[in-house]
Structure formats: C-alpha cells, structure tokens
C-alpha cells in the first residue's frame, strides 16, 4: 500500500480536549479528526466536504511524534459579543474582555502518514505536499497557530499480522497483545482521542492510545501493524 509521508510543525499548537471546559487543555498530538481537516485544507476541501473525502473507511492516518512534547499555559483574551456586537468598554457586569488560561503545545513537530483508496485524491495530495502548496491556510488546531510542512516521500507499506517491534507512531491500546517493553528515559502516556466523526461533528469513535512523549519508538508486541520499505513500523488509527 502506498503511503504519503510528510512532516508538520509550528511555534504553538492547540488540539482541544473534548472533556475540558472554561480552561481549555490540549492533546499532545493532532487526533485523526484534526489531521483530516489539515488534509482538506491542503487540497481545497471545504469544512462540509473533507469529513466525507477523508472518511475512516477510505483514508488511513498515522501520527508520529518527532520532538519532545512541551506544554505551556497562555492567556487568551475573549471579547464580549453578547447582543451580537462588541462593547469596547465595561458595561454593567460585563467586562469588554475576559482572559482565559489555555494550554498549548510548544514547538510541536509531527510526522503524518496518509493512505487513500482514491488514487486521484492520493496523487493530488502528494502533489500539493511535494510542491509545498495549499488551497487554504494550514494551522495546528486554531486558525492563529499557523503550520509549516515538508514532504518526506511516498513509501510502500505492508500489513503484518503480529510481532514484537519498535513502533514509531501512536499505538491504540487495543493493538497491544502482551504489553510493552519499558526503556529507561522513555515517558509513556495514554490518552483517549476522537478518531472518526460525521458531518454533524458528532464523534463516532474514540480510541485509547499510547504514545511516548519524547518522540522515541515504543517496543511492544502488537497485532495489525504496518511495516514500511524503510523499516519503520506504524499503526493506523
């Protein structure tokens, strides 16, 4: 199977966790639902179209962390727009601005693996990424957090039934057969992320995943992984 590989990075990223309220927290990496939006922005799919174009039954996505995850908190200034207009000064009990603390990933750097059943869409995506072109501006979660990307290649991947290997990407917990081999210095974390949603932005599937926050590979016995011609092993979400 042909897989497009490219790197994406920026100064800051914010992928809002679905279970946070007034003080937004971020996932450590972009979940598949966010990556689909990035892919749609690259080739020009609008917000109503990209969910279908990159649906889970047509598109496979894998995420690799390339640099250590560092999180910081910054204040976001929200303006008061009640009544459908902005008051630049305090009015009654309503301040002109409200500062909300939010969590961000600092200097995020990821590698994205993408495969698509539709050869035309796959080739178009590869052409845009290789020539460093986009139809819409690409960002990392929020429109203000601009992203840059770089083409890494198109590789052949073969599916493997089972084995003890070093996985480069984020791994679903359900793929582990006998746990993992802990290495000194590695930092392992688990998160529950959305992996699929419908046109109404209703999440159809969540997945508990394992990742190593320093960007190191995870040695584990897993089933259903994919091995590339360069020897890299990944798991599609």
Residues covered by each model-derived region:
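A broad, structure-centric signal for solvent-exposed, well-ordered loop/edge residues
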Residues: 13-15, 36, 112
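Extracellular structured ligand-interaction cores
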Residues: 3, 58-60, 107-111
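Internal, well-folded beta-alpha domain core
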Residues: 66-237
């Amino acid at each position: 199977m042909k897989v497009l590989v490219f790197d994406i990075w920026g100064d800051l990223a914010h992928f809002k966790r679905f279970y946070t309220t007034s003080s937004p927290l971020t996932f450590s990496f972009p979940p598949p639902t966010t990556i689909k939006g990035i892919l749609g922005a690259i080739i020009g799919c609008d917000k109503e179209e990209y969910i279908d174009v990159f649906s889970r039954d047509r598109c496979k996505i894998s995420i690799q962390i390339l640099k250590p995850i560092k999180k910081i908190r910054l204040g976001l200034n929200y303006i008061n727009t009640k009544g459908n207009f902005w008051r630049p000064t305090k009015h009654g009990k309503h301040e002109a601005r409200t500062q909300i603390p939010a969590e961000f990933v600092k200097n995020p750097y990821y590698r994205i693996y993408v495969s698509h059943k539709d050869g035309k869409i796959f080739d178009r995506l590869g052409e845009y990424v290789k020539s460093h072109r986009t139809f819409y501006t690409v960002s990392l979660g929020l429109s203000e957090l601009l992203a840059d990307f770089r083409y890494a290649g198109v590789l052949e991947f073969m599916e493997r039934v089972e084995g003890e290997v070093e996985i480069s990407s984020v791994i679903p917990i359900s793929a582990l057969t006998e746990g993992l081999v802990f290495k000194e210095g590695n930092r392992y974390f688990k998160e529950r992320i959305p992996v699929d949603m419908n046109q109404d932005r209703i999440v159809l599937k969540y997945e508990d995943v394992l990742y190593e926050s320093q960007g190191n590979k995870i040695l584990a016995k897993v089933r259903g992984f994919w091995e590339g011609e360069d020897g890299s092993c990944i798991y599609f979400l």
